[in-house]
Structure formats: structure tokens, C-alpha cells
């Protein structure tokens, strides 16, 4: 018999120590990695529930195992909420991650060797949009598109590449692009060559849900997203579509299960259902509006202090610092800011002279700081501290002074009160 009072601390001290140290790290560091966020205790409660025990291969009402009457309710709640939140008429909540969702879309609609247009990773794209080190770049013939001199997507070049290469699919979406994507224009280009238009909105799903960023669902044939990042739910994936193409929906479902996955993670799907309900609350819209305001506030400070921002600004939750002119590598900037308890990630910039392991840029995002209560004033102050560190990247005294300020503001604005 299993006793509910069993706990990790009494059984596995080494593991518990590492877990507790991570709790302290999250509370005492300012998180600026654009893909990270803090999920709610309600989501964590769902993920730690007895739903983790249940195998449920198949879909609600069509399972291969018995005893699924209650997990069917859980999954259907998640499906219905996803459709309502994003204005879709199809949703699959089973993908274990955003990458798994993308795998399912590719395998449902493409054959190995098919041509695909995806955003260049160095211009803000994602590994799963055709990077040669990823399955997408190995299985398919990838033609990259990118940004123009102004830092915006070059739609003329995209249309030209589409006409020349006649891809089977065009991918919209990004991991380090700070502009607004013209989904309608991309669909127009896809339709002109009879290609699938697939959008990966993982980074902006929360902004989309709150009406702060344009919704791709009415324009794309298929949309995928993660359920964490700006959506602030559990780590997982989601597939959406609109238009009533039942044949497409069947292909997508079959591609997820049994095509690429076995049993769904019911405890995570419950967490998704909670997060999707939270995203329907008025407070969530206020939060997402603040995310965008905070990112703009930080950009303004970096520009005032003489730092270059790719695209010259941001219209979402993230932006990219280009450090080429400062003769600072992204790797060194990441490390110095880390010593001041500010967490970022090094990131390639367009035409980066450095390798992806070194880079000349830093990606910065505002979802996590906003979640813990930062407004524009704190965001501007934080950006100033970051400039102090980068201006004096080898001065440990400056880094220590900034660290003490970080610790003070983290104590004032805890993640979990």
C-alpha cells in the first residue's frame, strides 16, 4: 500500500537538495529567457495528480484501454477550451511538446524529400523549421527565407522563393523575431502555389489568446503551439485548425497517435486544461498587455544606452540584442549577466560572424518578469542594470553591485508569494 505522506525529502536527499536549489535559483534570479515562464500552482497540482497513472491510448470515446471515462472528460475539457480560446474548430491536445506537434504535422502532410520554405534559424526561425541539425532539415528539402535590411520578414523574397521552388509547405512562426507577422500575406503566397500554410505560434500563443498579437488560426491550414512560454501552462504541445476539413483533422489525429506517440500524458493534459481556462480570465489579458509593454520599455533603454536591437524594436514579448559593434560575444554576455543573477540566452543574429556556440547576440523576453509583477518602471531599471554589466563586462565589482540589486527586487517581487 502506498502512503500519501511519502515524500522525496525523507527518501532521496540528493535529489531533493537539487530540487530545492532550483526553487531558490528561480526565486533569486531574474528570468529573461523568452521561452521560459512560471506556471500556476493549479497547473502543478494537476501535473502531480493520480492522472499520471492512467494509460489512455486513443482519443475521447475511442480508447484502446478501459477505465477512461474520467480522463475522457479531462481531455475533452482541454480540447473544447483550446478551440474556444483560439477560434479553432479542431484541436489535438496530446502532443508531448511543440516539436512533437510539428513532427506530427510534417508526417501527416509531407513525404521525405518534399520542399519546405521555413524561416532561417539565424534570422529568427526555429530548429524544427528546417535546421540541418534537426529532423526537419534532414528529412525535407528546406529553402530558407529571412528578414530584410529593416529587420522585417522579406515577403517579396519569400514570394519569389515560393514561385521558384514550389514548396509543398510554407512555415510561419519564429523563436527570435520581434515583429508582427502578416499571416494573411503568407497564406496568399502559399495559395498562389497551392502549398500548405503551417504556422508554429509557440512563442506568441499567450499574446494571441489575449488579442495582443494577430491570430494565425483564421489564415493557416494548421497551427501548432507549445502550452508553456507566453501561454504559461505546462510543458507540452497543441495542434489547432479551422475550416472544417475533416480529412485533414483525421490525418493529424492519426499522425499524433499512433503515428508518432503512444499513450498521452493525462496529468499534463489536465494541466493544459487548467492553463487554457486561466487564459480565458480577464487578468490574463492584462498580463499579456503588460508583457508587451515591458518588452518595449526595455528596448527603449537599450537603444538609449547605445545598444543595437535587431528590427529596431519589438511588437511582441521578445527582442534580440546585436552585440557585434560592441565586440562582445553572446556567450560572454550570457555568462556575465548570469553572474549578476540575470538569466538570458546567447543567440545568433543576422549575418552573425560567430558560431552558434558563441554567437554575437542575446535574446531577451519579458513573460517571466511580468509574471512576477514587473511593470515598466522595474523593466527599465532592469535594462539599465544589464547595460551596466555589458558596459563593464570584466568588472566583477559592477556585476556584484547589480547582483545585490537583483536579489533585492526578487525578494520584493517573489515568483510564488
From Swiss-Prot:
The modification N6-(pyridoxal phosphate)lysine is found at residue 229. Belongs to the SHMT family. InterPro entries: PyrdxlP-dep_Trfase, PyrdxlP-dep_Trfase_major, PyrdxlP-dep_Trfase_small, Ser_HO-MeTrfase, Ser_HO-MeTrfase-like, Ser_HO-MeTrfase_PLP_BS, SHMT-like_dom. The lineage of its organism: Bacteria, Pseudomonadati, Pseudomonadota, Gammaproteobacteria, Enterobacterales. It catalyses: (6R)-5,10-methylene-5,6,7,8-tetrahydrofolate + glycine + H2O = (6S)-5,6,7,8-tetrahydrofolate + L-serine. The record marks 228 as: Plays an important role in substrate specificity. Pfam families: SHMT. SUPFAM superfamilies: PLP-dependent transferases. NCBIfam families: PRK00011.1 (NF000586). Keywords: Amino-acid biosynthesis, Cytoplasm, One-carbon metabolism, Pyridoxal phosphate, Transferase. Pathway: One-carbon metabolism; tetrahydrofolate interconversion; Amino-acid biosynthesis; glycine biosynthesis; glycine from L-serine: step 1/1. Coiled coil: none annotated. (6S)-5,6,7,8-tetrahydrofolate binds at residues 121, 125-127, 355-357. Catalyzes the reversible interconversion of serine and glycine with tetrahydrofolate (THF) serving as the one-carbon carrier. This reaction serves as the major source of one-carbon groups required for the biosynthesis of purines, thymidylate, methionine, and other important biomolecules. Also exhibits THF-independent aldolase activity toward beta-hydroxyamino acids, producing glycine and aldehydes, via a retro-aldol mechanism. Its EC number is 2.1.2.1. This is Serine hydroxymethyltransferase. It is an enzyme of class 2 (transferase). It is found in: Cytoplasm. GO terms for cellular component: cytosol. One of its GO terms (biological process) is tetrahydrofolate interconversion. PANTHER family: SERINE HYDROXYMETHYLTRANSFERASE. Homodimer. Its cofactor is pyridoxal 5'-phosphate. One of its GO terms (molecular function) is glycine hydroxymethyltransferase activity.
